[in-house]
Amino acid sequence: MAIQTSNLGYPRIGLQREWKKTLEAFWSNKIDEEQFLTTMKEIRLQHVKVQQEKGIELIPVGDFTYYDHVLDTAYMLGFIPSRFSEFTSYLDVYFAMARGSKDHVASEMTKWFNTNYHYIVPEYEEGLQISLKDNRPLRLYEEAKKELGVDGKPVILGPYTFLKLAKGYNEEQFATILKELVAPYVQLFSELHAAGAQIIQVDEPIFASLTKDEINQAKELYEAIHKEVPNANLLLQTYFDSVEENYEEIIAFPVSGIGLDFVHGKEGNVNAISKYGFPADKILAIGCIDGRNIWRADLDDVLSLFTTLQNQITAKGLIVQPSCSLLHTPIDKTEETHLTSELFDALAFANQKLEELVLIHSALTKGVESISSDLTTYRNAHHAIRSSAARNREDVKVARTSLKEDDFSRPLPFEKRYELQQVALQLPLLPTTTIGSFPQTSEVRQTRKQWRNGDITNEQYNQFIEKETAKWIRYQEDIGLDVLVHGEFERTDMVEYFGERLAGFSFTKNGWVQSYGSRCVKPPVIYGDVAFISGMTIKETVYAQSLTEKVVKGMLTGPVTILNWSFVRNDISRKEVSYQIALALRHEIELLESSGIRVIQVDEPALREGMPLKEKDWDAYITWAVQSFLLATSSVENETQIHTHMCYSNFEDIVDAIRALDADVISIETSRSHGEFINTLKHTTYEKGIGLGVYDIHSPRVPSKDEMFTIVEQSLQVCDPKYFWINPDCGLKTRRTEEVIPALEHMVQAAKDARSLLKTNA
């Protein structure tokens, strides 16, 4: 049986974030289109070359993008909203869809399944002519072949997942639109096959969570495609979970190979193969290296998996590959020499994961003895990190085992608390606030860099932060906001900032991953037991409050978001790590309260994204996620108002969970999703404080007062004015001052108009 190495996708951003820098230089007109395209080609080919040099046989092509692979697919198929029809060039249309423009609202952006990557949501419109507008995968396949002699593996987002992720149609239209996708996909696969593509990877991650009716519908789709292009070798790729419930149907699809996730879906996929076997005429692509985390693989465990599978199946061939695209991991760990040896030795970034694939391939084809020294190295690394003091703290263990039931609930129910809070805070009807951060200007970033490099003193840096804070407190007062924030000028990132101040975290120098577009994040590494050390936000928040008579919110990131936006140790459950973080935050919240801060926001934007793909697994996750939030926030007095914030999510699935958080006020992204959550609230009630975001902060355009007033008006049809707040969709860190101030002025005026309307109607 032939065994090959393969990769599902490579990080786009470049070892020194060249991709990000090129994008932003183009957007700011520092380079022209020709230079942009030339540089992007160089980066793209370099990524192929790295994989070639690492010994990967099936190298992905077409996974590279200028922004997002879902957006690439939408453009390729002609899913271009009519509001962008005035743009003529490819890049103008493409980036307008992604980012919006002065006069055009961007397409919606949301989380890619349960990851921290965001995709641009395809929009279907009536009368849309679906066709293969642009065979970009073919161009990239031919480019790699011509420039590097690499017969690559084209990577395509599959038609079923693509349409399921799209919006703008009703359920009755789905089957019809699906049939319309057959022709362009047939043309795409046919042209790739004719050009010599030996195997074509078709990503269908949504197959992990389909019903029987849906999987049968998808099978009919692939049968229709196969009928027209029977000779194209399609590898149907699933990831992020098992396909256990639909495995029997999936192995009957008319494709040449099937890729399964044996990391995040190991138990289910192994069970399915044990029960149903695997077709002898198909290739099995085994996702055995974790594409979503940064830890070295347990090679003994992986080789044991292959033994189990090889004893049960007689496939046409095997492919050794990651569990998903390596998009979700940093590129290379070699620069992280500042880390302790026990942590450094435990890590594997994208390039190291490629090396692991080659090691496994060697063991399978040449015998385990061919990697005996590597196995010893790996075993020693695993033992060193497991037995480290950082992973065996007695104080953390005692705190966890001492928890009682009343540690997870507030003393009084919401209605009674809110009455006390209204007396204490003296806020108007429809209070206005922001989500937390204000613009991180080049001056802010440069000053922080100087401080970190030791070029300025702590005192100089603190004076600068206080100056920025005071300036924005004045701005907020002048604008007329009701609840102010200190602006978070001291923070690089809403997770990294807290991780730097808690035990159990470590940080990379170059561990960047793409979040959305050119935005890259450097997730903390939770490698040990998490514990409180000292106050993290007290100084800045108390200083801001001293400057104003108005209420200033304390700003924290919640335990589940810190968990979901970090690379997390894999030797204990995520629930246990989340509880450790919650206990540390509980201490911080108590310190804020005792320092006179009466409104404390604990952001949980990542609560929804951490949900398992399968509905049957939701309850268990939601239970411990909600309990983590309650553990962090429930020790405050009734008069202290707890806020939380969420963004980028499909909220209709978790309305009950949002309610169970028992936050006094929740703010939710609304405008970018075109009022989707407002529609959700038409079918359910939410009887606590809520603010539905009235403008999209991800676009540079300044919305008018009337636009915001319309969203407020729509919101008040489903929300009780008594409990309604007015705020932007998200934090304003990435916007410019000249965009933020007029937008907030319009927002405050919209709030005043809404109050007048309520008064008139009353």
From Swiss-Prot:
GO biological process, one term: methionine biosynthetic process
Catalysis performed (reactions): 5-methyltetrahydropteroyltri-L-glutamate + L-homocysteine = tetrahydropteroyltri-L-glutamate + L-methionine
Name of this protein: 5-methyltetrahydropteroyltriglutamate--homocysteine methyltransferase
EC numbers for this chain: 2.1.1.14
Binding-site residues for L-homocysteine, renumbered to this chain: I435, G436, S437, E488, D603
Keywords for this protein: Amino-acid biosynthesis, Metal-binding, Methionine biosynthesis, Methyltransferase, Repeat, Transferase, Zinc
GO molecular function, one term: zinc ion binding
Domain of life: Bacteria
Family matches, as InterPro entries: Cbl-indep_Met_Synth_N (IPR013215), Cobalamin-indep_Met_synthase (IPR006276), Met_Synth_C/arc (IPR002629), UROD/MetE-like_sf (IPR038071)
NCBIfam families noted in UniProt: met_syn_B12ind, PRK05222.1
Cofactor: Zn(2+)
Organism field: Bacillus mycoides (strain KBAB4)
Cofactor binding, per record: Binds 1 zinc ion per subunit.
Binding site for 5-methyltetrahydropteroyltri-L-glutamate: R17, E18, W19, K20, K111, R519, C520, W565, E609
Family: Belongs to the vitamin-B12 independent methionine synthase family.
Residues binding Zn(2+): H645, C647, E669, C730
Pfam families referenced in this protein's UniProt entry, alphabetically: Meth_synt_1 (PF08267), Meth_synt_2 (PF01717)
Keyword Metal-binding: yes
Binding site for L-methionine: I435, G436, S437, E488, D603
Metabolic or biological pathway, per its Swiss-Prot or TrEMBL entry: Amino-acid biosynthesis; L-methionine biosynthesis via de novo pathway; L-methionine from L-homocysteine (MetE route): step 1/1
Functional note: Catalyzes the transfer of a methyl group from 5-methyltetrahydrofolate to homocysteine resulting in methionine formation.
Transmembrane segments: none
